[in-house]
Design a protein with these regions (language model features):
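Nucleotide/phosphate-binding catalytic cleft detector across ATP-hydrolyzing
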Residues: 1-159, 167-287, 294-340
Length: 340
């Protein structure tokens, strides 16, 4: 991008937990989807990692917001501010003019027209000139390297922070899909609730997230892959005295069981609605897992045992949607039928 570049192309995975931006085939932004605003003026104080450091720690003058819930925009103004702040991180170096932005943004396949309009409006208010939307499972499939135009069935399960997107793809279209608002955030809430009920310790959302990363599991038996216990510090729910509680992966697996079962049922439901020929392709090719949820220990094995079809974790599950959106953006003419 030189001095006279007036159009900049960016691909964005606008996620409930994290927002990823790709420009010139490189990940240039990978930040938490959090913004801190001045309560009086609504002026942005911080965005991304800096705002997340403030999350659950602010005083009355500052509010920290996660503008997306369940994969869709919950706070339009905050989302616009956050997008603007994150896009500014892309604009490095000195330019005489701010470039016009050509954007492709990944959106949940179960989004309503109103929800799609909200994403488009936020992007346009954040200086997007040409804004295209692509459904997340389709973007994930492209990012994984699947030939989405082939006359062959492939299934993607994209587990994000706010929603799980399940789609059967063939001939450049989504044949059957199931978008449920059960995902990574629900696993975090399960851990918070479990720690409070079982150990009488209050843990923040961020601490529950750390527990999920360190000892989160979908299976109660991980064998050699078992992580060490994680020590949790927090106040006693009743006495407010400090506590130190070791947590093992087996108990976390038990507390996540119901939420994971919902994801299993959603996958089975999508398979039920899949035509037999495509179903045979999926059994042969296996099912692809992407999104942050794909990193939960043992999830692929649990799903495989339950559904009796091989599951593969994408090579870079956290960035599959963003990479796919980036490829679609570079080949807009070829993939125009996938854009909205």
């Amino acid at each position: 991008m030189g001095f006279f570049s007036f159009i900049q192309e960016i691909a964005m995975d606008l996620g409930t937990a994290n927002t990823i931006i790709i420009s010139d085939d490189k990940i240039v932004v990978d930040q938490p989807s959090v913004v801190a605003l001045d309560r009086r003026t609504d002026k942005m104080i911080a965005v991304g990692e800096e705002a997340k450091m403030m999350y659950e720690k602010t005083h009355d003058s500052i509010r920290t917001i996660r503008p997306l819930r369940d994969g869709v925009i919950a706070d339009f103004t905050a989302c616009e501010q956050m997008m603007r702040g994150l896009i500014k991180m892309v604009h490095t170096g000195s330019r005489l003019f701010s470039p016009s932005l050509r954007m492709v943004i990944g959106v949940p396949s179960g989004s309503t027209e109103v929800e799609l309009r909200a994403v488009r409006d936020s992007a346009e208010h954040a200086d997007g000139r040409d804004v295209y939307l692509i459904f997340e499972p389709m973007a994930a499939a492209i990012g994984i390297g699947i030939d989405v135009e082939a006359p062959e069935g492939n299934m993607i399960v994209d587990i994000g922070g706010g929603s799980t997107e399940i789609a059967v793809i063939s001939l450049g279209g989504i044949v059957s899909n199931n978008s449920i608002r059960t995902a990574g955030d629900d696993l975090t809430e399960d851990i918070q609730e479990y720690m409070s009920r079982q150990h009488n310790v209050k843990v923040s959302e961020r601490m529950a997230e750390r527990i999920k990363i360190h000892v989160g599991s979908a299976l109660t038996e991980l064998g050699e892959d078992a992580p060490e216990d994680y020590i949790v510090h927090g106040p006693n729910r009743i006495t407010a005295l400090p506590m130190e509680v070791p947590v093992c992966y087996q108990e976390v697996a038990h507390c996540l069981d119901k939420t994971i079962a919902k994801i299993e049922n959603a996958v089975l439901s999508a398979l039920e609605n899949t035509p037999p020929e495509l179903y045979a392709d999926i059994v042969k090719n296996g099912i692809w897992l992407s999104g942050g949820g794909a990193l939960l220990r043992g999830l692929d094995k649990r799903l495989q045992d339950k559904i009796n079809i091989p599951f593969h974790i994408a090579e870079d599950p956290l960035h599959s949607v963003a990479r796919g959106a980036g490829i679609a953006l570079k080949n807009v003419d070829r993939f125009s039928f996938l854009m909205r």
